[in-house]
């Protein structure tokens, strides 16, 4: 991965956003610090277990800067996500602007003395979508959302996922929280931290499948080896759950953090699936 990025400016980011054919760039840490006001709390727009997201202000546009937490500092995972993002350009996939992989020495106190330690900064830069995630539309707005918009959102998600599968990329964590909406409610798939890019290596085996309870297919839990030929089906299962939630206007679970066993998880979903037809909003 080429980390030479010293000449990139805020104006370059503007041009990348305006040019749909422009490739993502390696970005200097100083640039990302500047546009987020030093990663200030005022610019923070979201956070999770693995990253904090900041709003980056350009002259006429805005970007989202995803700053990985220390717990996420797995080089292979970061490189895999960047690899997937560099390969994709589609109207239903979040626009990837660039990345930063910065490592510098810092004197840190350890065992009553100072030692030189490597400080890793890993960041991703995307287009900014002010409407936020599909999550809130399912729980609130979708009950009154016109069918044509629900149809548009479902169609867009399907097209984006189909594009990924054509590129031999499986997402493996498709859910409403990982689908953003633009000002016209056009959906864009995001968060490729768990994705796998098979490319020509379609026989490559994935032995560890992660994801989110409620959207994981049952076969994700049986410890079988997964290749591209069967892993894309996991995305299709997740897609089905997302579609059901868009149609019903509610989730199939209420507090997934309290699910302690797979048996409780599957029982909950069995009840949901048996009743979802009666919950679909009238067209």
Put a short name on every predicted segment.
Residues 29, 34-43:
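Conserved N-terminal boundary motif of the eukaryotic protein kinase catalytic domain
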Residues 2-23, 27-31, 63-86, 92-152, ...:
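Cytosolic eukaryotic protein kinase-like domains
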Residues 159-169:
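Protein kinase catalytic-loop region centered on the HRD/HxD motif
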Residues 48, 88-91, 167:
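Conserved N-lobe motifs of Hanks-type protein kinase catalytic domains
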């Amino acid at each position: 991965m080429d980390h030479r990025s010293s000449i990139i400016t805020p104006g370059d980011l503007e041009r990348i956003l305006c040019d749909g054919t422009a490739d993502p760039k390696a970005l200097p840490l100083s640039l990302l610090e500047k546009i987020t006001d030093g990663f200030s709390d005022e610019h923070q727009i979201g956070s999770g277990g693995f990253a904090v997201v900041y709003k980056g202000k350009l002259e006429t546009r805005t970007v989202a800067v995803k700053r990985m937490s220390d717990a996420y500092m797995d080089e292979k995972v970061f490189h895999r996500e960047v690899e997937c993002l560099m390969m994709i350009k589609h109207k239903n996939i979040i626009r990837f602007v660039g990345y930063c992989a910065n490592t510098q020495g810092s004197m840190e106190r350890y065992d009553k003395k100072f030692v030189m330690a490597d400080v890793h900064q890993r960041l991703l830069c995307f287009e900014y979508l002010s409407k936020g995630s599909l999550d809130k539309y399912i729980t609130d707005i979708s009950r009154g959302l016109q069918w044509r918009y629900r149809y548009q959102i479902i169609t867009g998600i399907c097209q984006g996922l189909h594009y990924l599968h054509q590129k031999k990329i499986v997402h493996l964590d498709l859910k409403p929280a990982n689908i953003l909406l633009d000002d016209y409610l056009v959906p864009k798939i995001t968060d490729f931290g768990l994705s796998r890019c098979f490319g020509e290596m379609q026989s490559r085996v994935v032995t560890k499948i992660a994801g989110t309870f409620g959207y994981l297919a049952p076969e994700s839990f049986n410890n079988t080896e997964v290749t591209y030929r069967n892993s894309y089906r996991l995305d299709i299962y997740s897609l089905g759950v997302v579609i059901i939630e868009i149609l019903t206007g509610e989730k199939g679970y209420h507090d997934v953090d309290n699910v302690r066993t797979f048996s409780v998880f599957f029982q909950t979903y069995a009840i949901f699936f048996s009743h979802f037809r009666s919950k679909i909003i009238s067209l």
